[in-house]
Amino acid sequence: MPRKGPAPKRPLVVDPVYQSPLVTQLVNKILLDGKKSVAESIVYGALEGARDKTGGDPVVVLKRALDNVKPAIEVKSRRVGGSTYQVPIEVRPTRSTTLALRWLVGYARQRREKTMTERLLNEILDASNGLGAAVKRREDTHKMAESNRAFAHYRW
């Protein structure tokens, strides 16, 4: 194993249009095959659409959507004496943001709209209203943690 320790965390470059690190993270999650300009046009198009449909600041809409998707608790597999338990653990804030963005983009990709911009826009709007597949994923995660609460003492 390497003895140098963990790699230092690189600072996130702030988005040039909205001055928000969240938008930068969203662009990086959309990114495929290194085509950053394509990812940026998808995200900016979706945020412009959010501005048109809500009449408000699109970054606020995105933050509201993320707050509705962020999990507070999740389950991790833990092997104890030959059987595997799903142990509920709290989610760190950075991980919850990352998971929320990952779920938002993942379920936007599965939607049926014609362009990725429309899919992302509608998933963000649904999530900000407490609807959509990403919010359902969070509810399922919380339900799973709640049903396995008996194993919470196996935490590490």
Curated annotation (Swiss-Prot):
Q: Which domain of life is it from?
A: Bacteria
- Gene Ontology terms describing biological process: translation
CDD domains hit by this protein: uS7_Bacteria (cd14869)
| Keyword tRNA-binding set for record | yes
- Pfam families under this entry? Ribosomal_S7
Entries under SUPFAM superfamilies matching the protein: Ribosomal protein S7 (SSF47973)
Q: Which GO terms describe its cellular component?
A: small ribosomal subunit
Indicate whether RNA-binding appears among the record's keywords. yes
- Which of UniProt's keywords are assigned here? Ribonucleoprotein, Ribosomal protein, RNA-binding, rRNA-binding, tRNA-binding
Among NCBIfam families, the record links this protein to: rpsG_bact
Q: Which family is annotated?
A: Belongs to the universal ribosomal protein uS7 family.
| Name this polypeptide is given | Small ribosomal subunit protein uS7
Organism, by scientific name, is: Kineococcus radiotolerans (strain ATCC BAA-149 / DSM 14245 / SRS30216)
**Which gene codes for it?**
rpsG
